């Protein structure tokens, strides 16, 4: 499993409830760009439109070798492939309980297919974010102390 892009900001801004795997509908030039590692999920989000699920605002850069006829939209909407039951479950959680769906990472699976890890998440408050930073800092200090102890 080769990870192409990771959304680190999502792990900081949201508390993850449940993770899902989804396939992505891509054009050939997009797959070539992903193989070169030219993807960014920083400001991306997932929406359900007419019972179909889309990854919006994800950035896949163009390669300079791509012919102008085959160029793709860098920030276009990309359809995600999931089972109907999973989409219905996500739709129910998002509409009723106020959760959001966030893309965590893009990767190539063992069959060289591009997959996305999605998460059902709840937004963190400012004090939750501060608490996360404090935990992270405490872990770093503990590791440093253990390293110096040896």
UniProtKB/Swiss-Prot annotation:
Alphabetical UniProt keywords: Cytoplasm, RNA-binding
Could you name the domain of life of the organism this protein comes from? Answer: Bacteria
Q: Which InterPro entries match?
A: SmpB, SsrA-bd_prot
What Gene Ontology cellular-component terms does the record carry?
Answer: cytosol
The UniProt entry's GO biological process terms, in alphabetical order, are: trans-translation
Q: Where in the cell is it found?
A: Cytoplasm
> Per the record, a Pfam family?
SmpB
Q: Gene3D superfamilies this protein is in? A: 2.40.280.10
Has UniProt tagged this entry with the keyword Cytoplasm?
yes
Which GO MF terms does the UniProt record name? RNA binding
Against NCBIfam families, the record matches this protein to: PRK05422.1, smpB
| Family per record | Belongs to the SmpB family.
Q: Which HAMAP family match?
A: SmpB
Main function: Required for rescue of stalled ribosomes mediated by trans-translation. Binds to transfer-messenger RNA (tmRNA), required for stable association of tmRNA with ribosomes. tmRNA and SmpB together mimic tRNA shape, replacing the anticodon stem-loop with SmpB. tmRNA is encoded by the ssrA gene; the 2 termini fold to resemble tRNA(Ala) and it encodes a 'tag peptide', a short internal open reading frame. During trans-translation Ala-aminoacylated tmRNA acts like a tRNA, entering the A-site of stalled ribosomes, displacing the stalled mRNA.
In Swiss-Prot or TrEMBL terms, this protein is called: SsrA-binding protein
Upper lineage is: Bacteria, Pseudomonadati, Campylobacterota, Epsilonproteobacteria, Campylobacterales
Gene behind this chain? Answer: smpB
């Amino acid at each position: 499993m080769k990870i192409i892009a990771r959304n680190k900001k999502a792990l900081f801004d949201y508390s993850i409830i449940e993770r899902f795997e989804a396939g992505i509908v891509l054009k050939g030039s997009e797959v070539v760009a992903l193989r070169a590692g030219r993807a960014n999920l920083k400001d991306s989000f997932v929406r359900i439109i007419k019972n179909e699920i889309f990854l919006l605002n994800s950035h896949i850069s163009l390669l300079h070798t791509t012919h102008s006829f085959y160029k793709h939209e860098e920030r276009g909407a990309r359809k995600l492939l999931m089972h109907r039951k999973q989409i219905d479950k996500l739709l129910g959680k998002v509409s009723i309980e106020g959760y959001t769906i966030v893309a965590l990472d893009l990767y190539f699976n063992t069959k060289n297919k591009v997959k996305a890890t999605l998460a059902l998440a709840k937004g963190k408050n400012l004090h939750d974010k501060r608490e996360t930073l404090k935990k992270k800092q405490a872990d770093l200090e503990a590791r440093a102390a253990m390293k110096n102890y040896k």
